[in-house]
């Protein structure tokens, strides 16, 4: 699997969307480096959480549109935290939770398929059920991270019961949409390296 991930990573971009995704990925990396010197440690930590997602989407050989969507979504999600958009714009939190969890659930589908945790059945319901389950799990983990940050790092993190449940519902709905889309469209490039 490592060889396939490396092969996908080093494959040169071939389409405009792939070039744009790589540019966004580079911006994410540079942004974290700049943040390390210019922003508080908590903001740098939040921004650095984008890096695994933006790199993994390239390494998995996702279709260019999904790769770009992953990159943009996680950067918007982290950036919204740093510049406090979640408090400033009502509903932004739920929208970002839905979209971000949706794209990450799509990534999870590819990882679970590549590692043979799930076996393609040909049934359209499989990616719907698996993506929704993965999205709900990711939402729960994220809410635990938020709680941990609030409890042990800074009380400026907004954590309430209603916010937590709302975020998880939005994430679950986003993952459900991702599963429906995955049941109808291929998530990976046809020419990607596989295990």
Residue ranges of model-derived segments:
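"…centered on the first transmembrane helix and the immediately adjacent amphipathic helix/loop
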Residues: 2-102, 106
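Alpha-helical transmembrane spans of integral membrane proteins, capturing the lipid-embedded, hydrophobic core
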Residues: 26, 51, 98, 102, ...
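Alpha-helical transmembrane segments of multi-pass membrane proteins
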Residues: 54-58, 73-80, 105-109, 134-142, ...
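Membrane-interfacial alpha-helical segments at the cytosolic side of multi-pass membrane proteins
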Residues: 99-116, 150-157, 172-185
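Membrane-interface capping segments at transmembrane-helix boundaries
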Residues: 183-194
């Amino acid at each position: 699997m490592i060889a396939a991930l490396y092969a996908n990573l080093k494959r040169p971009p071939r389409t405009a969307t792939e070039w744009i995704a790589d540019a966004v990925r580079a911006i994410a990396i540079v942004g974290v480096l700049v943040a390390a010197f210019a922003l508080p440690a908590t903001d740098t930590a939040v921004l650095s959480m984008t890096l695994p997602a933006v790199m993994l989407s390239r390494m998995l050989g996702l279709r260019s549109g999904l790769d770009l969507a992953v990159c943009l979504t996680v950067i918007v999600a982290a950036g919204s935290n740093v510049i406090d958009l979640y408090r400033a714009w009502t509903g932004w939190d739920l929208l970002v939770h839905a979209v971000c969890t949706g794209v990450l659930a799509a990534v999870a589908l590819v990882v679970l398929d590549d590692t043979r945790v799930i076996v393609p059945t040909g049934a359209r319901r499989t990616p719907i059920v698996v993506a929704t389950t993965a999205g709900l799990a990711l939402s729960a983990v994220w809410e635990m991270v938020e709680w941990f940050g609030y409890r042990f790092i800074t009380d400026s993190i907004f954590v309430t019961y209603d916010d937590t449940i709302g975020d998880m519902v939005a994430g679950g709905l986003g993952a459900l949409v991702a599963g429906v889309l995955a049941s109808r469209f291929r998530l990976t490039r046809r020419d990607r390296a596989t295990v």
